[in-house]
Amino acid sequence: MLNDVIAVTNRKLSQRPFLEQIKRVCHLRPEAIILREKDLSETEYAKLAEEVYNITTSYDVRLIIHTYINVARELGINTVHMSLHNMREYRKEFIDNVNKTNNI
């Protein structure tokens, strides 16, 4: 239904329980959801990401992780949204991963 929409989260703006809101958004079938909860530690984010991933997967909606590359890896997610500053910081790691993927 919303194939050209990428939803971006902010659980502080949700008027209903956050995971319930994620289900409602997934029901609308967006292209993807970016889990952009910038105030969480990586540990807190990982726990929430796993819960959200279980929901998005059941609706066949792609989940995009924000900033935390290790969380994306743990969940088997290959799309990460981040600032240009962070991208520059992880640049070598990205290049190495692309080279491994493409057998370069």
Predicted features, each with a name:
Residues 1-89, 95-103:
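Conserved N-terminal beta1-alpha1 strand-loop-helix module at the mouth
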